[in-house]
Each structure stands twice: as C-alpha cells, then as structure tokens.
Amino acid sequence: FRAAQCGFGYRRSVFRENPGRYLVVSVTYRLAAGVRGTVAYAELRKALGKSAAAAPLTDVYSTVLDHRRAKSMVIEADNPNRRSVGYFFVNPVLEARELADLSNRARSAGFEDLPFHPVGENHFKVPAAWLIERAGFAKGSRHKSVGISDAHALALIHHGGGTSAELVEFARQIRREVLVRFGIELQPEPVFVGFPTANPLSAGQSTE
C-alpha cells in the first residue's frame, strides 16, 4: 500500500474500515527535512501559542511528546501506567436529543458540568473519561491484575501477571455502570484478537 491507498484520516483508514481483512506487520516512513506540519489539535495549538502555525517540527515534536507523556502515553520503563493500548473506549458522539437526555441524567445524579463539543451538524462529542469517572471508576482503580491508569481514565492498564479475561471482565464492569447511570453504551477502541467475537464486551460473550 502506498500512503494514498491507506485512506488515512482522523481515526480512520482502509484497514479500520475493513476489519479482519488486513494485518499490518511493517510500516515504512518517508520524511522530508525542513517542512512544517499542520497543527490542528486544539491542546497542541494552545501549548505552542501564537507560533503554532509556524512552529518548527522539532518544537511540535517536543510538545506532542510532553503532552502524551503527561497522560502516560509514552512507553517508559519507569512508568507503571505504560502497559496499555492507549485509550480503551471511544468518546461517544451524540445527536442533540441524546445529549439533552444525557444532560438530564447527569443533573439527576448531581453532576452539572457535563462537557461536550460539536462535531458536525447536530452531533456532539462527550468525553468517555468523564462518564467513566462519574460512574464510580476513578483514575488508579484496580481490578485483579488490571486497572485504570493514574494519568487518564480512558486507559486500561496491566499491572503484570494478569490475563485478557481479567481485562475484558473489568471493561465490562465499566461499560455496564456507565450504561446504567447515563444510558450510554461505550464502544471499545482496540481490535480484539483471539476472541470468538469482534466485541467480547457484549453481554453473554465469552472472555476466553
């Protein structure tokens, strides 16, 4: 595949749109010296300040690395949160009616600060981490040999000596509590390999 054939976009690619068809075993990058990247991510633009549009790639690289390190998304031997696949659940995108229902549920539970931002016409993205923490799963929570990262509630981590069944069991607990409290069914972001179904978090599915 050449780059154009991969269909890369924000959280999308030809590989993601054809689950089970492809297995990526190697990647080759062609880099160019002296170019400037497009800085579109809001937190990154804020960190770079007024110079974001003209920032050298070295500055962008350092800022991205600092940003990811703060969320324990950099593999470092001395970081206990390093064993993860990144963010485990997808941030739900809701229609206006669904957002209103979620806001009402949140207020009824005593939460007035439901965060969201628009993503296209009549659709809004809600942080899954916010839902997870307010469903009773704080950062640093633990279940057997797995748990939630101390740095970000969306990252499920492995403390060592555990099994994939323990991880799926814990993810199911989180998913169930968010659904009961907020009426939102979180969807997993990673691809599951070696399970009977594509989504072992669904009720009634085996964890083996």
Segments and roles (model prediction):
Residues R2-A165, R181-E208:
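Phosphate/pyrophosphate- and phosphate-bearing ligand-binding catalytic cores of soluble enzymes
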